[in-house]
């Protein structure tokens, strides 16, 4: 879960001020709960208790400071993340107090830095592996944009270990459910990501021949 715009303030202001929520309609926890409940989202209470309400499938917003967060659905610690990025939010100050907010930020800081570092390192390493395997740049960008979202994470771990079988399995599994026009005009081969193919096909002629036996071993149906 990350803010759409990085406005992090390294200091916690000690000044007193009257809190004026930017979205008054979501000041109550019931209103925030309802914003999630109507979209059939599970375990939404942790988000509404953190002062956040549902905006879209890719975005939630703090009713008080107005900060918008993306990549939120699988976040386990929304209160800590909210406080980490919006340290002078009136809701966070009222909920935890200045001392409590500072302690929470200090305890979360190590976890956050380690988590971000590991993900960044894996993305860089994975990008290099995909490049070495001959995947096209737009294809790699598409893979990395979805790679760390469950249930695809297990395939990325195999890519990091340079297992070409699982790289192909991941790419084909992902694209078989999401028919993608990578440049909005051309559809590329699901296997190599390089050769353009017709709209009603999934693989180029070379990959159809080379990978026929390979795709027969997979656990899902792929049109050859």
Curated annotation (Swiss-Prot):
Keyword rRNA processing carried by entry: no
Signal sequence region: none
Keyword terms, alphabetized: Metal-binding, Zinc
Keyword Zinc: yes
Source superkingdom: Viruses
List of residues binding Zn(2+): 62, 65, 82, 89
Designated name of the protein: IAP-like protein p27
Species this chain originates from: African swine fever virus (isolate Tick/South Africa/Crocodile Cr3/1996) (ASFV)
High-level lineage: Viruses, Varidnaviria, Bamfordvirae, Nucleocytoviricota, Pokkesviricetes
Gene: p27
